[in-house]
C-alpha cells in the first residue's frame, strides 16, 4: 500500500494501560505535542491528589497557554492500594471526587471546545468502581467527533478496546518498588 492510500481521522481515542511505568508520562508528552501544534487541550486527572511533578509542570505552563489549556485535578489520593491508600478519605468521598472529575471530563469531551481531552488515571477509577464502565463507554461514544480522547491507567476494560484507535500496554519488566523501595521524586512522580 502506498503512502498516498492512507487517510487521516478527525479524532482518535488513545489508551495507555498496563502494569508498567509511563502511562502518565506518555499522556504529558501527548499534551506537549498537542499544545505545540496549537491545539486546545484539557488535562483531567483522576485519583492523584498530592502535588506530583506533572501537576507542577502543568501549573507552570498554564499561563503560557491561557485558554488553550484546561487543567483539573480531582482525585483524593490512592484508593484500594493497601498502605499507600489515603487514610482519612472514605469510599464515598473517593466516589464523589471521581464523579465530579468525570463530569468535568465529560463536559470537556462533548463540548467541541477542545481538540484533545486527556483523562489521566480514569482507567483506575473504573477498575476500582469509583465510576462505572458504562460511564467510560459513554464518554468515548459521546465525545465530540473532532475531539481526540486519551485514557490512561491500569486495567482498561478489554471489552472496550474496540473503541480505541491506538492502544498501548505498558509492560513492567522490573521496578524498584518490588524490592521495597519507595517511588523517586522526579522519576516516578
What are the residue ranges of the model-derived segments?
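Conserved nucleotide-binding/hydrolysis micro-motifs of P-loop NTPases
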Residues: 47-50, 76-79, 123-124, 155-158, ...
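Phosphate-binding/switch loop-helix module in NTP-utilizing enzymes
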Residues: 83-145
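Phosphate-binding/switch region of NTP-binding enzymes
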Residues: 154-189
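Catalytic phosphate/metal-binding cores of nucleic-acid and nucleotide-processing enzymes, i.e., regions
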Residues: 8-12, 145
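Sensor-1/coupling segment of RecA-like P-loop NTPase cores
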Residues: 141-157
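Conserved P-loop
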Residues: 11-110
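Hydrophobic anchor at the start of a short beta-strand
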Residues: 41, 149, 167
Amino acid at each position: 500500500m502506498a503512502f498516498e492510500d492512507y487517510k487521516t481521522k478527525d479524532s482518535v481515542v488513545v489508551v495507555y494501560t498496563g502494569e508498567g511505568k509511563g502511562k502518565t508520562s506518555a499522556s504529558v508528552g501527548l499534551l506537549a505535542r498537542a499544545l505545540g501544534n496549537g491545539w486546545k487541550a484539557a488535562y483531567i486527572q483522576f485519583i492523584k491528589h498530592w502535588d506530583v511533578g506533572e501537576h507542577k509542570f502543568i501549573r507552570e505552563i498554564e499561563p503560557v497557554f491561557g485558554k488553550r489549556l484546561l487543567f483539573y485535578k480531582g482525585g483524593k489520593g490512592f484508593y484500594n492500594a493497601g498502605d499507600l491508600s489515603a487514610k482519612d478519605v472514605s469510599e464515598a468521598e473517593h466516589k464523589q471526587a471521581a464523579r465530579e472529575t468525570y463530569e468535568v471530563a465529560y463536559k470537556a469531551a462533548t463540548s467541541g471546545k477542545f481538540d484533545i481531552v486527556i483523562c489521566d488515571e480514569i482507567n483506575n477509577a473504573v477498575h476500582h468502581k469509583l465510576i462505572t464502565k458504562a460511564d467510560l463507554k459513554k464518554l468515548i461514544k459521546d465525545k465530540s467527533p473532532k475531539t481526540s480522547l486519551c485514557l490512561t491507567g491500569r486495567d482498561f476494560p478489554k471489552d472496550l478496546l474496540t473503541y480505541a484507535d491506538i492502544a498501548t500496554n505498558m509492560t513492567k519488566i522490573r521496578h524498584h518498588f518490588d524490592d521495597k523501595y519507595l517511588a523517586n521524586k522526579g522519576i516516578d512522580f
